From Swiss-Prot:
Disulfide feature: 29-40, 281-306, 390-391, 583-609, 585-628
Signal sequence segment: 1-23
InterPro entries: Cys-rich_flank_reg_C, Leu-rich_rpt, Leu-rich_rpt_4, Leu-rich_rpt_typical-subtyp, LRR_dom_sf, TIR_dom, Toll-like_receptor, Toll_tir_struct_dom_sf
Domain of life: Eukaryota
Composition skew (Polar residues), residue ranges: 830-841
Domain called TIR: residue spans: 673-816
Protein name (database record): Toll-like receptor 4
Length: 841
């Protein structure tokens, strides 16, 4: 027990300490691609983590403390293809360090202060194509043991301490070398012996970068008969004289691409004289680029004479001022002028020029016509140019133009429908201000146009024929514009070959049902950043080839259930994020559809509810159908309850007095009646009731007590309550005096209906009908129930004659005596006049 207690006492603090350690200390690397790519950058590692899988192909160990790389250091990763060891403070690399990495193609050693590099350090790297050894304290290429890397294509040893340009003999064993970067070293002189290996074993695909080396001298003839793919000399010369002599030292060089000049932040030359380029006459060049040279001195008319036969010339950030140097008819086929300083637009006349790029230039606002008859590609973007009456072949001096980019300029007024430019395939106006585009069919003649960009051109589309003639168009971008009434009309009728359409940020609220009917080839449709309120899938039903649909950043609440089936079957990518979804049971089918279509919907997890308030900013996927089932149950129960209450209320309201009568029957059912009969009659017949009925019955023998409303009803009590409580409940029988006035009186009919109920509820009750006068059958049939009763039952009919009166009163008294408790007097009187009642129908 004591031993166990001691063990527990020791383990508890240890466990506490371990629990405080970060989980990264056990598994430090970030898994970028499972079992393939791992990033272990800046983790203070002193060795390679043991838990990295053997299948790893990309491993980043940069910014650690590996310091010493021993033999077979990476043999656990035979599949490795890319290894980054940048700035790991590596000082020693032993023999066979990378042995076994037969698939490694890229090795990066940047920023390591290597002091000892064994001759067999790079053995085993039979597939290595790129080796980066920037800032590795390398002093000479002779000390770099790479002669066996026959597949090496790129060697970057920039920013070291190499003083000699001498290329070792082993370069003859690197036949695939394409790029050698020696920039920012300490090379000052280049001699013929330095490049002897290039004379013996030409590397025709080699591009050589010597920028930022303090060159002072190049021995004449050094590069004679040498062929290079490219040579870059930027920020190399401290004076104009040195530059001139060094360029002359390149005489005899044949290169596909030559780059001269300086870097933006590495300026050494104060002035640039046209004579600097005279030495280029002794070189054979296909492409020439000059960058960041300004303050030209002297006449620059003949500046480019030595470049007359160059195919491609590029001027980057050059301040020429005068344009005389560009006004000659050189044989250039490709001219780039980027971010240069000119007084005015160059009026070029280059008969061979096929491609002209003139972008980001300063202080030029007015376009000037030029003559370029062979021109096919023209890029004039970002110059703040204005065009009046654009565009026709006379503006550019060519009828062969296929690519025209006028984007990011000022105002462009369309004055013609591109006459003479029928071969155009690419046209870009984005972020320029287009005018008069609604005046006529500006693109009518462009039947070969495949790409059109009029995005953010400040146009409001009114003219429905704006795209007439564009029968070959495949890509149309028109984002950031607007439409009349914010409605997208049917303007794409002729665009049957369209595959990409961008309508984002067009303030669209509605889309015509036939807007996309002609676009059966459309594959990509961008409807984002508009004001659409619903996902109307009927619009997209004709788009049989549609693969990508972006409806993000709208105001879509939902889509109708029956419409969701109309989305094209070809659709593979649908973006509905950033909309105002209504997560309510009304749209339950749509919300369920969102859950079912997660593979189709991009960013389904980012689809948020906008309403109701209790679900605002919650994911649409969090909506639960059970909520709707519960709500439906509650609603159903509530509806049924309301209906039942309503029905009961209506029945109670309709039969309120009948219920009162029923309650009274139970209350007074066993008591004695006060009245012999309750008389129901019309006020129009009150004289007959007073003078005949009351006088003969109450003053006759035997006397009968009648209940009359004008005499026996209690004041202050509702008429209906008096009728039931004083009339029916306290009377043995009911006398109904039927006349034309009775039939037409609502109160009389009401009293009669209550009397029927009273007769049904009380076994002793009886109704005696007295018909005062002959009634028209048409009038009597208006009261169906009364008509039926009078047709089937015995009633008394009043006749104003001596015999008729005698018979009437005898029969009425007999009817009233039925069920009446007999008194001795009443019995004797009744026996003196025994008579039978006669029936009249």
């Amino acid at each position: 027990m004591m031993a166990r207690a001691r063990l527990a006492a020791a383990l508890i603090p240890a466990t506490a300490i371990l629990s405080c350690l970060r989980t990264e200390s056990w598994d430090p690397c970030v898994q970028v691609v499972p079992n393939i790519s791992y990033q272990c950058m800046e983790l203070n590692l002193y060795k390679i983590p043991d838990n990295i899988p053997i299948s790893t192909k990309m491993l980043d160990l940069s910014f650690n403390y590996l310091r010493h790389l021993g033999s077979h250091n990476f043999s656990s990763f035979p599949e490795l293809q890319v290894l980054d060891l940048s700035r790991c403070e590596i000082k020693i690399i032993e023999d066979d360090t990378f042995q076994g990495l037969n698939h490694l193609s890229t090795l990066i050693l940047t920023g390591n202060p290597i002091q000892s590099l064994a001759w067999g350090a790079f053995s085993g790297l039979s597939s290595l194509q790129k080796l980066v050894a920037v800032e590795t304290n390398l002093v000479s290429l002779n000390d770099f043991p790479i002669g066996h890397l026959k597949n090496l294509k790129e060697l970057n040893v920039a920013h070291n301490f190499i003083h000699s340009f001498k290329l070792p003999e082993y370069f003859s064993n690197l036949p695939n070398l394409e790029h050698l970067d020696l920039s920012n070293n300490k090379i000052q002189n280049i001699y013929y012996e330095d490049v002897k290996v290039l004379h013996q074993m030409p590397l025709l695909n080699l591009s050589l970068d010597l920028s930022l080396n303090p060159l002072d001298f190049i021995e004449p003839g050094t590069f004679k008969e040498i062929k290079l793919n490219g040579l870059t000399l930027r920020s190399n010369f401290n004076s104009s004289h040195v530059m001139k002599t060094c360029i002359q030292g390149l005489a005899g060089l044949k290169t596909n691409r030559l780059v001269l000049g300086e870097f933006k932040n590495e300026r050494k030359l104060q002035r640039f004289d046209r004579s600097f380029l005279e030495g280029l006459c002794n070189l054979t060049i296909e492409q020439f680029r000059i960058a960041y040279l300004d303050k030209f001195s002297g006449d620059d008319t003949d500046l480019f004479n030595c470049l007359a036969n160059v195919s491609v010339i590029s001027l980057l950030s050059i301040s020429l001022g005068s344009l005389q140097a560009l006004l000659k008819d050189f044989r250039w086929q490709h001219l780039e002028i980027i971010n240069c300083d000119f007084d005015k637009f160059p009026a070029l006349k280059l008969s061979s020029l096929k491609k002209f790029v003139f972008t980001d230039n300063k202080d030029i606002s007015t376009f000037t016509e030029f003559q370029l008859p062979s021109l096919q590609y023209l890029d004039l973007k970002r110059n703040h140019l204005s065009f009046k009456g654009c565009c026709s072949h006379t503006d550019f001096g060519t009828t062969n133009l296929k690519h025209l980019d006028l984007s990011f300029n000022d105002v462009i007024t369309l004055g013609s429908n591109f006459m003479g430019l029928e071969q155009l395939e690419h046209l870009d106006f984005q972020h320029s201000t287009l005018k008069q585009i609604n005046a006529f069919s500006a693109f009518l003649s462009l039947r070969n146009l495949r790409y059109l960009d009029i995005s953010y051109t400040n146009i409001r589309i009114v003219f429905h024929g704006i795209f007439t003639g564009l029968v070959s168009l495949q890509t149309l971008k028109m984002a950031g514009n607007s439409f009349q009434n914010n409605l997208l009309p049917d303007i794409f009728t002729e665009l049957t070959n369209l595959t990409v359409l961008d309508l984002s940020k067009c303030q669209l609220e509605q889309v015509a049902q036939t807007a996309f009917h002609s676009l059966s080839s459309l594959q990509v449709l961008n409807m984002s950043h508009n004001k659409l309120l619903s996902l109307d899938t009927f619009l997209y039903e004709p788009l049989h080839s549609l693969r990508i649909l972006d409806c993000s950043f709208n105001r879509i609440m939902a889509s109708k259930e029956q419409e969701l089936q109309n989305l094209p079957r070809s659709l593979t990518w649908l973006n509905l994020t950033q909309n105002a979804f209504a997560c309510v049971c009304e749209h339950q089918s749509f919300l369920q559809w969102v859950k079912d279509q997660r593979q189709l919907l991009v960013g389904a997890e980012q689809m948020m509810c906008a309403e109701p308030l209790d679900m605002e900013d919650m994911p649409v996927l969090s909506f639960r159908n059970a909520t709707c089932q519960l709500s439906k149950t509650i609603i159903s129960v509530s509806v049924v309850t309301v209906l039942l209450v309503s029905v009961v209320g209506v029945l109670v309201y309709k039969f309120y007095f009948h219920l009162m009568l029923l309650a009274g029957c139970k209350k007074y059912g066993r008591g004695e009646s006060i009245y012999d009969a309750f008389v129901i009659y019309s006020s129009q017949d009150e004289d007959w009731v007073r003078n005949e009925l009351v006088k003969n019955l109450e003053e006759g023998v035997p006397p009968f007590q009648l209940c009359l409303h004008y005499r026996d009803f209690i004041p202050g009590v509702a008429i209906a309550a008096n009728i039931i409580q004083e009339g029916f409940h306290k009377s043995r029988k009911v006398i109904v005096v039927v006349s034309q006035h009775f039939i037409q009186s609502r109160w009389c009919i009401f009293e009669y209906e209550i009397a029927q109920t009273w007769q049904f509820l009380s076994s002793r009750a009886g109704i005696i009908f007295i018909v005062l006068q002959k009634l028209e059958k048409s009038l009597l049939r208006q009261q169906v129930e009364l008509y039926r009763l009078l047709s089937r039952n015995t009633y008394l009919e009043w006749e104003d004659s001596v015999l008729g009166r005698h018979v009437f009163w005898r029969r009425l008294r007999k009817a009233l005596l039925a069920g009446k408790p007999q008194s001795p007097e009443g019995t004797a009187d009744a026996e003196t006049n025994p008579q039978e009642a006669t029936t009249s129908t």
